[in-house]
């Protein structure tokens, strides 16, 4: 019988020193504060500032998380793209409720969105698809996301085969590749604070406006 090692990481901690978030710092619309924080994350040269963890659930209620990149946003929604045969896309076809989380650790900040996802039309998707690097377009064809493969060489071989196939002309949009628009109705902003007295504010949509509450850390 193999032995199982136990790892105690309770002593791994640090203090949060960057300052707090006060009500006077808030904006009327949550997307305005999100845009400000995102710009600050970009200006601070954070790695992948548009990376977000998205959570979905399967038909049995089992949650799954993965990292994707935010590509567009406006005052009501956020957009990401994916393979429509992926696990996340299948989950959203069954239950379109979704959570998106931006962890900006160096800035001691987090932002969480709750909402519902809907598929973008091919017309909406194709413009973004053709703005991607050509090799990324080909990779979208090569990978049947979440399917089982015997070795990485299978994937690389398929990529090279498709690269030759699409050597001349435009790479067409795969029918199995698309995007999702997440319309959000709840946004929480978290800012680290001294002595674990973190600042949390939650925006919740009420008709055409937003109600804001401070939450205990």
UniProtKB/Swiss-Prot annotation:
Q: Look up the record and name the cofactor or cofactors this protein needs.
A: FMN
A Gene Ontology biological process term:
pyridoxine biosynthetic process
Q: Give the signal peptide range.
A: none
**InterPro entries to which the protein is assigned, alphabetical:** Pyridox_Oxase, Pyridox_Oxase_CS, Pyridox_Oxase_N, Pyridoxamine_oxidase_dimer_C, Split_barrel_FMN-bd
Q: Which SUPFAM superfamilies match?
A: FMN-binding split barrel (SSF50475)
Catalyzed reaction equations: pyridoxamine 5'-phosphate + O2 + H2O = pyridoxal 5'-phosphate + H2O2 + NH4(+); pyridoxine 5'-phosphate + O2 = pyridoxal 5'-phosphate + H2O2
Q: Keywords of this protein's UniProt record, alphabetized? A: Flavoprotein, FMN, Oxidoreductase, Pyridoxine biosynthesis
This entry's Enzyme Commission designation comes to: 1.4.3.5
Q: In which pathway does it act?
A: Cofactor metabolism; pyridoxal 5'-phosphate salvage; pyridoxal 5'-phosphate from pyridoxamine 5'-phosphate: step 1/1; Cofactor metabolism; pyridoxal 5'-phosphate salvage; pyridoxal 5'-phosphate from pyridoxine 5'-phosphate: step 1/1
Q: Which domain of life is it from?
A: Bacteria
Which PANTHER family does this UniProt record tie to the protein?
Answer: PYRIDOXINE-5'-PHOSPHATE OXIDASE, PYRIDOXINE-5-PHOSPHATE OXIDASE
Please give the family membership noted in the entry. Belongs to the pyridoxamine 5'-phosphate oxidase family.
**Tell me, what does this protein do in biology?**
Catalyzes the oxidation of either pyridoxine 5'-phosphate (PNP) or pyridoxamine 5'-phosphate (PMP) into pyridoxal 5'-phosphate (PLP).
Protein name in UniProt: Pyridoxine/pyridoxamine 5'-phosphate oxidase
**Lineage, opening ranks:** Bacteria, Pseudomonadati, Pseudomonadota, Gammaproteobacteria, Enterobacterales
What is the primary gene name for this protein? pdxH
